[in-house]
């Protein structure tokens, strides 16, 4: 695991001064590291009959699609407003300064489907809590919310269903 962590570079003062940004593009660019990361996460869910993997815009699309392929599941996209072509459900949620909104196609999840929600990073948990609400309202059965990385000092998992959070790497 430590070798995977070493493929993620720190970018100081991005996106603003005082922040150390965990840049996952270096891991994604390395075929062996990317494959290993996806396999390590996917192995947790093999045999659980996941119906769909929900990928959260934008880096969650990369991880979600790769996991869905490995698990033989469909892919559902959660996007910013106005990006999905058919009828959507939307969820507005609070940010540190303001609000944001996410959308999902109304017909993307059927009641009782087993859903894995995937994103690259668990930080404050606000975005994922909004996605959990949407999937729950659509009567999807959330297997887990999975992340490639987690910033544990931000306590994001406190906003998510207890026992339904998995992160491969913690910082």
Curated annotation (Swiss-Prot):
Pathway: Purine metabolism; AMP biosynthesis via salvage pathway; AMP from adenine: step 1/1
GO biological processes: adenine salvage; AMP salvage; purine ribonucleoside salvage
GO CC terms: cytoplasm
Compartmental location: Cytoplasm
One Pfam family from the record: Pribosyltran
Keyword Plastid applies: no
Domain of life of the organism encoding this protein: Bacteria
Gene3D superfamilies (UniProt xref): 3.40.50.2020
Catalytic activity, as annotated: AMP + diphosphate = 5-phospho-alpha-D-ribose 1-diphosphate + adenine
EC number annotated for this UniProt entry: 2.4.2.7
Principal location: cytoplasm
Any one GO molecular function term: AMP binding
Uppermost EC category: transferase
Keywords of this entry: Cytoplasm, Glycosyltransferase, Purine salvage, Transferase
Family: Belongs to the purine/pyrimidine phosphoribosyltransferase family.
Subunit and interaction comment: Homodimer.
Role, per record: Catalyzes a salvage reaction resulting in the formation of AMP, that is energically less costly than de novo synthesis.
PANTHER family linked to this entry: ADENINE PHOSPHORIBOSYLTRANSFERASE (PTHR32315:SF3)
Name of the protein: Adenine phosphoribosyltransferase
Gene: apt
